[in-house]
Amino acid sequence: GRADYNFGYGLGRGTRKFFNGIGRWVRKTF
């Protein structure tokens, strides 16, 4: 349904932002 789609979309964006933040932290730290 639409709610499922919006949830998955938000989850995907959040996950991408999360991993981008991790990648930035890793490059800054190592």
UniProtKB/Swiss-Prot annotation:
Major site of localization recorded for this protein: secreted
Activity response to pH changes: Activity is stable between pH 2 and 12 at 25 degrees Celsius.
UniProt subcellular location: Secreted
Keywords: Antibiotic, Antimicrobial, Bacteriocin, Secreted
Keyword Secreted recorded: yes
Any GO CC annotation of this UniProt entry: extracellular region
Claim: Endoplasmic reticulum is one of the keywords in the record: no
S-S pairs: none
Temperature-related properties: Thermostable in a pH-dependent manner. Retains 100% activity after 15 minutes at 121 degrees Celsius at pH 4. Retained activity is lower when incubated at basic pH or pH 2.
One GO biological process term: killing of cells of another organism
Function as written in the Swiss-Prot or TrEMBL entry: Bacteriocin with activity against species of Lactobacillus, Lactococcus, Pediococcus, Leuconostoc and against B.subtilis and, to a lesser extent, against B.coagulans, B.cereus and species of Enterococcus, Listeria, Kocuria, Staphylococcus, Corynebacterium, Salmonella, Pseudomonas and Escherichia.
Note: Antimicrobial activity is lost upon treatment with alpha-chymotrypsin, trypsin, pepsin and actinase E, but not when treated with proteinase K or endoproteinase Glu-C.
Protein name: Bacteriocin plantaricin KL-1Y
Source organism (scientific name): Lactiplantibacillus plantarum (Lactobacillus plantarum)
